[in-house]
UniProtKB/Swiss-Prot annotation:
Gene that encodes the chain: dnaK
Gene3D superfamilies cross-referenced by the UniProt entry: 1.20.1270.10, 3.30.420.40, Actin, Chain A, domain 4 (3.90.640.10), Substrate Binding Domain Of DNAk, Chain A, domain 1 (2.60.34.10)
Extent of Low complexity compositional bias: 578-598
Segments of this protein annotated with the region Disordered: 578-608
Induction of synthesis: By stress conditions e.g. heat shock.
Key word Chloroplast present: no
UniProt-recorded name of the protein: Chaperone protein DnaK
Species, as recorded: Streptococcus pyogenes serotype M49 (strain NZ131)
Protein function: Acts as a chaperone.
PANTHER family named in the record: HEAT SHOCK PROTEIN 70KDA
GO terms, molecular function: ATP binding; ATP-dependent protein folding chaperone; unfolded protein binding
Length: 608
């Protein structure tokens, strides 16, 4: 079987690795670097990727950076006189990685395992898979970055039982995953994150500071000058890296712009203390996902054996200190934060080819999935942090008599009401035979594959007709939407519960009216008019309350109707039981008569 390469497709940098024997090895790019900038530029129709593209970013406006942040959206980038989708730009990076991996291996590479942030939604995962396909790669598996890191960390520790926390702060995304390792099984217990938090945000804080200071001194806003801004970005990234090793750095950008008196230069000193002050809010934002993941996993900090740091941004001293303070543990520094994800992806490639044995990877889905049901309620079929691949079915029915079709509205999120969650797709199951409401049986099945990609099926159990959809949304969940879902779910829990209670009550009232009307009709002329009249009276009162919309009145009248309807049902069952008993008695008497009337012949037996 041909080699399966492991690719860490990062926001700012990417890496590729391959399994050699039982060891995962990072493949250096043509410039000898073990990571490649995720940068694409266009010059005279030529596509340039990696270090060369990054070097000319200052002078070449046709340069695309941080494309990963646009994956799963319908946003396009204009360059080279064309419009490109994020998948196409990502595919150019993947092609470059694939090319130098082939040069190293001396053979064609057609398959890859590609990593994504654990908090990537369905659209973003699908977009990543599509990018691989465009690059000529068969994507064997999409693996969550923290999970891949854990795989690389734990490969030589398969005989140990450990619970580890992976803290993954990359260039554009942040994930926290809790895993349990033991006997070769890598079991993800929970994952949380922030899809809009990473090294780029730390760089931006420095850029904003430099722009503000320069404006104070010279009255010129550098953020309006595209070329100056690119130089500031490069300087900010360098300063950030410098401050991981020293306590002060000098930022020097000669001829950054020109004023009325001639050229202007930017000369500024930045201390680590000032950098920490500028980025304090970003460091604070890393704490909530850590607590969320621990809570979802049902673990306390004392139960965590190791904390693994992943991603170049975990080299920032303030981040390391925050991790120590939050977990009470010294982070494990046995893995290279820039390379460990690609190495883990290559190990997963080895698991697929059979070169790595006795390793099982159990990943999870980051957000709950379900459909919209009556009253706009979000009915979850698969909860967040469910191990994948997984499949879940639930039977629903029609909401009206003779309903010919049902709309299946597929959603992802954590809020109780459908309108507050993210639509993944819609489809329709048609040609449902005419029947009273509640009679047709519509089975809805959700499947999440090993890559976290969703497909949904609706089947009419009566006719066996079914419709199927693989979710391929063009506008994936934005980072704000994911963050909003989790934060809103907590902030609005009380209001959500009230709204859901209202809808549930209205649905219950509707169902009770329907069921009681049916019972009253079925018992007409059967001799218990007192109970029927009482039920009818309670039914009329509930309908009046329903019309008024007063929830307390509806609740009281619903209880009264349930009591009267139950009394009517008891009479029905008593009558049915009496009729059945009478029928059985008649059958018994008939059998006895038949036995008594049988002719009996006495005979004499003679032995000869």
């Amino acid at each position: 079987m041909s080699k399966i390469i492991g690719i860490d497709l990062g926001t700012t940098n990417s890496a590729v690795a391959v399994l050699e024997g039982t060891e995962s090895k990072i493949i250096a790019n043509p410039e000898g670097n073990r990571t490649t900038p995720s940068v694409v530029s266009f010059k005279n129709g030529e596509i340039i990727v990696g270090d060369a593209a990054k070097r000319q970013a200052v002078t070449n406006p046709e340069t695309v950076i941080s494309i990963k942040s646009k994956m799963g959206t319908s946003e396009k980038v204009s360059a080279n006189g064309k419009e490109y989708t994020p998948q196409e730009i990502s595919a150019m990076i993947l092609q470059y990685l694939k090319g130098y991996a082939e040069d190293y291996l001396g053979e064609k590479v057609e398959k890859a395992v590609i990593t994504v942030p654990a908090y990537f939604n369905d659209a973003q995962r699908q977009a990543t898979k599509d990018a691989g396909k465009i690059a000529g790669l068969e994507v064997e598996r999409i693996v969550n970055e923290p999970t891949a890191a854990a795989l690389a960390y734990g490969m030589d520790k398969t005989d140990k039982d450990e619970k580890i926390l992976v803290f993954d702060l990359g260039g554009g995304t942040f994930d926290v995953s809790i895993l349990e390792l033991g006997d070769g099984v890598f079991d993800v217990l929970a994952t949380a994150g922030d899809n809009k938090l990473g090294g780029d945000d730390f760089d931006q804080k420095i850029i904003d500071f430099l722009v503000e200071e320069f404006k104070k001194e010279n009255g010129i806003d550098l953020s309006q000058d595209k070329m100056a801004l690119q130089r500031l970005k490069d300087a900010a990234e360098k300063a950030k890296k410098d401050l991981s090793g020293v306590t002060q750095t000098q930022i020097s950008l000669p001829f950054i712009t020109a004023g009325s008196a001639g050229p202007l230069h930017l000369e500024m000193s930045l201390s680590r203390a000032k950098f920490d002050d500028l980025t304090r809010d970003l460091v604070e934002r890393t704490k909530t996902p850590v607590r969320q993941a621990l809570s979802d996993a049902g673990l306390s900090l004392s139960e965590i054996d190791e904390v693994i740091l992943v991603g170049g941004s975990t080299r920032i001293p303030a981040v390391v200190e925050a991790v120590k303070a939050e977990t009470g543990k010294e982070p494990n520094k046995s893995v290279n934060p820039d390379e460990v994800v690609a190495m883990g992806a290559a190990i997963q490639g080895g698991v697929i080819t059979g070169d790595v044995k006795d390793v099982v990877l159990l990943d999870v889905t980051p957000l709950s999935l379900g459909i919209e049901t009556m009253g706009g309620v979000f009915t979850k079929l698969i909860d967040r942090n469910t191990t994948i691949p997984t499949s879940k079915s639930q039977v629903f029915s029609t909401a009206a008599d003779n309903q010919p079709a049902v709309d299946i509205h597929v959603l992802q999120g954590e809020r109780p009401m459908a309108a507050d969650n993210k639509t993944l797709g819609r489809f329709q199951l048609t040609d449902i035979p005419a029947a009273p409401r509640g009679i047709p049986q519509i089975e809805v099945t959700f499947d999440i594959d090993k890559n976290g990609i969703v497909s949904v099926k609706a089947k009419d159990l009566g006719t066996q007709k079914e419709q199927h959809i693989v979710i391929k949304s063009n506008d994936g969940l934005s980072e704000e939407e994911i963050d909003r879902m989790m934060k809103d779910a907590e902030a609005n829990a009380e209001a959500d519960a009230k709204r859901k209670e209202e809808v549930d009550l209205k649905n219950e009232v509707d169902q009770a009216i329907f069921a009681t009307e049916k019972t009253i009709k079925e018992t007409e002329g059967k001799g218990f008019d007192t109970e029927r009249d009482a039920a009818q009276s309670a039914l009329d009162e509930l309908k009046a309350a329903q019309e008024s919309g007063n929830l307390d009145d509806m609740k009281a009248k619903l209880e009264a109707l349930n009591e009267k309807a139950q009394a009517l049902a008891v009479k029905m069952y008593e009558q049915a039981a009496a009729a059945q008993q009478a029928a059985q008695g008649a059958e018994g008497a008939q059998a006895n008569d038949s036995a008594n009337n049988d002719d009996v012949v006495d005979g004499e037996f003679t032995e000869k």
